[in-house]
Amino acid sequence: LTAIPPVNDNLLATAQAVYKAWFVEYKPFGGNCPISWRVGSVDEIAEFFDSMRKPLSSLERADMARIYPYYGAVSIVDYVDDYIFDGEYLLLSEDGIYVVDDSGHPLLQHIIGKFWANNHAHILKGKAGFTEDSLYLFLSNTNMSPIVTGAAQPKINQANLKSFPITIPDSEVLDRFNSIVHPLFDRKLNNEKEIRKLETLRELLLSRLVS
């Protein structure tokens, strides 16, 4: 279990370095932003599934079998006996103690598999040529502090997120970029899935030892 997180950190760092080279330094394009690129909005590249979220109280979860992860704003909160989502999604923190990091970048979870989510995170999938991998990299490198509202309870509401401006490259560039970063994310997500399996097995073995 302890060996996998450093590997995943390196995989993500590599993907972030590729993003920086392409979309910050524009190295494949002679150091200049191509004129064919444009500024669009998040709702042009992300599909929202917030209407499918369903919060469960701790009392509701107490009697459930611990099978599927139950996600909150920034992490797994619990495990439950059913799931709402099945596939690859991004969860972007909607409200909580923190919704952006020190650089103003949104807090994201990149998930694959069956899971439940409460209403403290926006549920997204890529569209218009954006995969969940490229959507993750574009959003995680975007300063969204201007749309964070609320002093006591910071929040990024859906309307502000959908309309937030973001750079959209042409489809050929995006396809090439996707082909480079996908193997990195694929390995990272598979590693995380293996971690969850091992953690579940460990919990099962421990419960049998004390019963």
Q: Where do the model's predicted regions map?
A:
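DNA target-recognition domains and sequence-specific DNA-contacting regions of bacterial/archaeal
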Residues: 33-34, 38-169
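Non-catalytic DNA-recognition/assembly elements of restriction-modification systems
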Residues: 1-55, 60-73, 167, 171-211
